Amino acid sequence: PQTDGRYIGYCPEGWSYYKLSCFKYFPEPRSWDEAESRCQEVKKGAHLAWVEDAHEAATLRRTISYYQRVQPVWIGLQKSKESQAWQWTSGKDYSATREMPGNGARGGSCAALTHHSGFSVWSSADCSRQHHYICKFYP
Protein backbone atom coordinates (compact mmCIF):
# COMPACT_ATOMS: atom_id res chain seq x y z
CA PRO A 1 0.00 0.00 0.00
CA GLN A 2 1.14 3.51 -0.79
CA THR A 3 2.31 5.51 2.19
CA ASP A 4 1.09 9.02 2.80
CA GLY A 5 4.60 10.44 3.01
CA ARG A 6 4.89 12.04 -0.38
CA TYR A 7 1.54 13.82 0.04
CA ILE A 8 2.26 15.45 3.38
CA GLY A 9 2.54 18.96 1.93
CA TYR A 10 -0.12 18.47 -0.72
CA CYS A 11 -3.20 19.57 1.23
CA PRO A 12 -3.28 22.28 3.90
CA GLU A 13 -3.11 21.16 7.51
CA GLY A 14 -6.41 19.69 8.66
CA TRP A 15 -7.45 18.72 5.12
CA SER A 16 -7.53 15.12 3.83
CA TYR A 17 -6.64 14.23 0.29
CA TYR A 18 -8.07 11.87 -2.28
CA LYS A 19 -6.30 11.58 -5.63
CA LEU A 20 -5.81 15.22 -6.59
CA SER A 21 -8.37 16.88 -4.34
CA CYS A 22 -8.37 18.01 -0.72
CA PHE A 23 -11.40 17.98 1.53
CA LYS A 24 -12.30 18.87 5.08
CA TYR A 25 -15.18 18.12 7.42
CA PHE A 26 -16.79 21.02 9.28
CA PRO A 27 -18.80 19.94 12.35
CA GLU A 28 -20.74 23.21 12.51
CA PRO A 29 -24.43 23.40 11.59
CA ARG A 30 -25.11 25.64 8.58
CA SER A 31 -27.79 25.92 5.90
CA TRP A 32 -26.68 24.60 2.48
CA ASP A 33 -26.07 28.12 1.12
CA GLU A 34 -24.17 29.18 4.24
CA ALA A 35 -22.08 26.02 4.07
CA GLU A 36 -21.24 26.61 0.39
CA SER A 37 -20.27 30.24 1.17
CA ARG A 38 -18.17 29.08 4.10
CA CYS A 39 -16.26 26.61 1.89
CA GLN A 40 -15.44 29.45 -0.51
CA GLU A 41 -14.32 31.71 2.36
CA VAL A 42 -12.11 29.08 3.94
CA LYS A 43 -10.24 28.21 0.76
CA LYS A 44 -10.13 29.82 -2.67
CA GLY A 45 -11.68 27.43 -5.19
CA ALA A 46 -13.37 25.30 -2.54
CA HIS A 47 -17.01 24.22 -2.70
CA LEU A 48 -19.25 21.80 -0.87
CA ALA A 49 -17.82 18.42 -1.86
CA TRP A 50 -18.76 17.02 -5.25
CA VAL A 51 -18.14 13.34 -6.01
CA GLU A 52 -16.38 12.07 -9.11
CA ASP A 53 -16.05 8.35 -8.47
CA ALA A 54 -17.03 5.56 -6.09
CA HIS A 55 -13.67 5.56 -4.30
CA GLU A 56 -14.04 9.24 -3.58
CA ALA A 57 -17.54 8.58 -2.20
CA ALA A 58 -15.98 5.96 0.09
CA THR A 59 -13.36 8.46 1.24
CA LEU A 60 -16.12 10.95 2.15
CA ARG A 61 -17.92 8.21 4.09
CA ARG A 62 -14.79 7.39 6.06
CA THR A 63 -14.09 11.04 6.79
CA ILE A 64 -17.61 11.66 8.07
CA SER A 65 -17.65 8.48 10.17
CA TYR A 66 -14.38 9.51 11.76
CA TYR A 67 -16.10 12.59 13.21
CA GLN A 68 -19.60 11.32 13.91
CA ARG A 69 -22.17 8.73 12.89
CA VAL A 70 -25.57 10.36 13.43
CA GLN A 71 -25.77 13.86 11.91
CA PRO A 72 -26.69 14.47 8.26
CA VAL A 73 -23.93 16.13 6.23
CA TRP A 74 -24.36 18.52 3.31
CA ILE A 75 -22.57 17.69 0.07
CA GLY A 76 -22.20 19.82 -3.06
CA LEU A 77 -25.31 18.70 -4.87
CA GLN A 78 -28.36 20.88 -5.46
CA LYS A 79 -31.43 20.85 -7.67
CA SER A 80 -31.16 23.56 -10.30
CA LYS A 81 -34.08 26.00 -10.14
CA GLU A 82 -34.03 26.44 -13.92
CA SER A 83 -33.70 22.86 -15.16
CA GLN A 84 -34.90 20.97 -12.07
CA ALA A 85 -31.91 18.68 -12.64
CA TRP A 86 -29.54 17.80 -9.80
CA GLN A 87 -26.19 19.49 -10.26
CA TRP A 88 -22.82 19.25 -8.50
CA THR A 89 -21.05 22.38 -7.25
CA SER A 90 -18.41 21.55 -9.89
CA GLY A 91 -21.03 22.45 -12.50
CA LYS A 92 -21.52 18.87 -13.71
CA ASP A 93 -25.00 17.37 -13.93
CA TYR A 94 -25.64 14.62 -11.42
CA SER A 95 -26.97 12.14 -13.98
CA ALA A 96 -23.46 11.88 -15.39
CA THR A 97 -22.17 10.74 -12.03
CA ARG A 98 -23.55 7.32 -11.31
CA GLU A 99 -20.94 6.70 -8.63
CA MET A 100 -23.06 7.84 -5.72
CA PRO A 101 -26.68 6.70 -5.50
CA GLY A 102 -29.26 9.15 -4.25
CA ASN A 103 -32.91 9.74 -3.55
CA GLY A 104 -34.33 13.11 -4.54
CA ALA A 105 -37.89 12.19 -3.63
CA ARG A 106 -37.98 13.55 -0.09
CA GLY A 107 -38.68 17.15 -1.09
CA GLY A 108 -36.12 19.91 -0.74
CA SER A 109 -33.52 20.92 -3.29
CA CYS A 110 -30.24 20.16 -1.52
CA ALA A 111 -28.44 16.87 -0.93
CA ALA A 112 -27.29 15.48 2.40
CA LEU A 113 -25.65 12.19 3.30
CA THR A 114 -27.39 10.49 6.22
CA HIS A 115 -26.47 7.77 8.65
CA HIS A 116 -29.44 5.64 7.54
CA SER A 117 -27.41 4.64 4.49
CA GLY A 118 -24.07 4.73 6.29
CA PHE A 119 -23.45 8.04 4.48
CA SER A 120 -23.34 6.22 1.14
CA VAL A 121 -26.61 7.45 -0.42
CA TRP A 122 -27.68 11.09 -0.59
CA SER A 123 -31.19 12.25 0.23
CA SER A 124 -32.86 15.48 -0.75
CA ALA A 125 -33.47 17.86 2.13
CA ASP A 126 -34.75 21.35 2.80
CA CYS A 127 -31.82 23.68 2.00
CA SER A 128 -32.52 25.86 5.04
CA ARG A 129 -31.92 22.98 7.47
CA GLN A 130 -28.70 23.32 9.45
CA HIS A 131 -26.26 20.46 8.96
CA HIS A 132 -22.56 19.72 9.19
CA TYR A 133 -20.79 19.90 5.83
CA ILE A 134 -17.74 18.85 3.87
CA CYS A 135 -15.70 21.11 1.56
CA LYS A 136 -13.44 20.17 -1.33
CA PHE A 137 -10.93 21.90 -3.60
CA TYR A 138 -8.14 21.13 -6.05
CA PRO A 139 -4.82 22.59 -4.87
Task: Give a label for each model feature.
Residues 1-139:
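Extracellular, disulfide-bonded carbohydrate-recognition/adhesion ectodomains
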